[in-house]
Every structure is written in C-alpha cells, then in structure tokens.
C-alpha cells in the first residue's frame, strides 16, 4: 500500500458505535453562546452501496457512516458546516463523496484523494476540482512504503495544487515534516493543512519541533484533532492538550483548527467531546481564540457561503 493505512481499523472499532452516537447532544444554552458558526474541517462518510463499491483490498467497514447520521450529529451539537475528507475505504474512487457533495452543497465541502504514484495525478486533481472538490489529501506513512513523498512525482502534483488554489492536506507522522518542509520551500505561498498535529507522540514532545518548523510558511495550518487518540489519559486529555498549547503559542489561533475526525473518534470518545474539549476544557484559550479555531480559521481555508 502506497500511503498510510491506519484508518483500515475503522471497520471493526467504529462499527459498534456509528449508529448510536447521534444521541449525544449539548445543552441548548451552550449552543446559543457563540456568535460564530462552528465548522468541522475533518469528517469521513461512507455507505455500503453497490453503486459506490469499496476499493479492492480495503477492509470493508462493518457499518455505515452516512451523511444523514452526520447531519444529525451536527444538528445536536450546533455544528453548521463540515468538510468531508475522502475515506481510505474507497481509495482514489471519489464518486461517493462527489455524490454526497451534490446532495448537500450548502452544508459540505469535499477533499479528494489522488494516487500519488500515478504520473497523471495532477490532471486527476484538476478534473476533481472541476467537479467541486476543494482540496486533496496525501498520506505518506513513516516507513519506506511512504517514501514517494520525496520522489519525482510530488513537485508536479504540488505545483498543480498551488495553481488550482486548493489546499493540500497531509496525513503523515511527525517524522515526515522535514520532507514536507522541503516541498514547501518551492511553493512557500501554497495552502497546506497538517492533519491531527502530525500525530506527534505525547511522550516525545521534542518531536513537535518538526511540525513547528513549518510555521515559517504563512499558509500552513494545523488541525489540533486527535487529542483523544494521542492522549494516555481520560477526557479532557490534558497530556495531549500540552501539544495544542505549544502550537497555539507558535502558530497562533488564526492558523489552528479543531476537528472531530468522525467516525474514527468513536473508537475512543464521542463526537461531542471533540468539540467540548476545545470549547470548554482548553483553559488556555480565550473567547477570541475559540472563534478562530472553531470557525474563522477554517473559513480561511474552506470559505462557506453565508
């Protein structure tokens, strides 16, 4: 497999919870407190449907994670809009996500996947952008199987992404950040979003400096998601909050964004907790910080209509 495959566990860990999470709601008074709309920049959806088959060789998820289930969660938790990320179950077949975007054009935006080992990937990205996608995701793993990130096919793909003015999103371990920086040196104004704090281990905090080094590029953003998966503690995951605190001190709230990573989160925590940990339990954030990290930063990258 050419890219990171950690999400293949979804079929077994999420299957028992996807159908029940919709009941998790927040207090109405809390929902009314914010004067901005909350936007979730990282969610996956899929459905067992012969019209949109899962990719060969991928582990088939036990249950669906449908847009309709997601819409219920969003309503219950006061989330207005969501950015949908192409899930690994379909690999580079983006048709189900394209179908979903056509169904709910005012609520969702989509980030596609292209095959990083295909020389035609830049043209595929152009075609997908014409279809309405607003970004592409690459996921190089930490071992030799992910070394394509340093190969000759990357500069043309990154250049096309920059020309199309759509964000590149990167799922990669923190050890890959220096290689990401080398690609950014050639396109320093390009919009790049690093997923999940580069999954920096909480017991190796010095490794976060590899991610912090990307601060010098003005359009690099970081999702502070995965506090729940990186932590060795129960909610509110104070050990992984320390990573967020350092990123907040260096990047500032204008370049950080929260995310649920639903339904992956349901193997460990609740959809609502991905929101409340930022909104209620990161005590080092003030109200203005939260307005950026829950809303305005995301709109810098993925602007939604009013």
Language model feature labels by segment:
Residues 2-26, 36-41, 60-81, 245-246, ...:
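Mid-to-C-terminal alpha-helical segments outside catalytic/metal-binding sites
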Residues 30-31:
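Cleavable N-terminal signal peptides
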Residues 35-164, 202, 238:
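Mid-domain alpha/beta scaffold segments of enzyme catalytic cores
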Residues 43, 197, 261-262:
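Active-site metal-binding loops of divalent metal-dependent hydrolases
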Residues 74, 101, 105, 184-185, ...:
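N-terminal cationic-hydrophobic initiation segments that often serve targeting/anchoring roles
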Residues 84-86, 113, 223-226, 257-259, ...:
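Short beta-strand segments
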Residues 97, 180-183, 278:
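Hydrophobic packing residues within well-ordered alpha-helices of enzyme cores
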Residues 148-257:
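Catalytic pocket-lining loop regions of alpha/beta-barrel enzymes
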């Amino acid at each position: 497999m050419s890219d990171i495959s950690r999400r293949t566990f979804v079929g077994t860990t999420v299957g028992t919870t996807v159908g029940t999470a919709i009941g998790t709601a927040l207090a109405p008074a809390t929902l009314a407190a914010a004067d901005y709309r909350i936007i979730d920049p990282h969610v996956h959806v899929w459905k067992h449907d012969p019209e949109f088959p899962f990719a060969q060789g991928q582990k088939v998820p036990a249950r669906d994670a449908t847009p309709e289930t997601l819409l219920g969660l969003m309503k219950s938790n006061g989330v207005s809009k969501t950015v949908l990320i192409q899930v690994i179950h379909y690999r580079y077949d983006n048709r189900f996500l394209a179908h979903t975007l056509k169904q709910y054009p005012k609520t969702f935006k989509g980030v596609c996947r292209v095959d990083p080992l295909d020389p035609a990937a830049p043209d595929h990205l152009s075609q997908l952008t014409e279809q309405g996608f607003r970004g592409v995701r690459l996921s190089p793993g930490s071992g030799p199987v992910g070394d394509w990130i340093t190969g000759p096919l990357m500069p043309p793909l990154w250049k096309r992404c920059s020309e199309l003015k759509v964000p590149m999103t990167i799922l990669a371990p923190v050890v890959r950040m220096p290689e990401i920086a080398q690609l950014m040196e050639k396109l320093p104004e390009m919009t790049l979003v690093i997923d999940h704090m580069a999954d920096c281990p909480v017991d190796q905090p010095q490794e976060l400096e590899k991610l912090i080094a990307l601060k010098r590029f003005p359009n690099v953003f970081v999702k502070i998601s995965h506090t729940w998966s990186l932590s060795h503690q129960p909610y509110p995951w104070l050990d992984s909050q320390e990573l967020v605190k350092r990123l907040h001190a260096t990047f500032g709230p204008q370049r950080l964004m929260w995310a649920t990573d639903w339904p992956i989160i349901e193997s460990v925590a609740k959809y609502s907790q991905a929101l409340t940990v930022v909104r209620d339990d990161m005590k080092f954030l003030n109200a203005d910080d939260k307005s950026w990290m829950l809303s305005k930063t995301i709109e810098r990258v993925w602007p939604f209509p009013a």
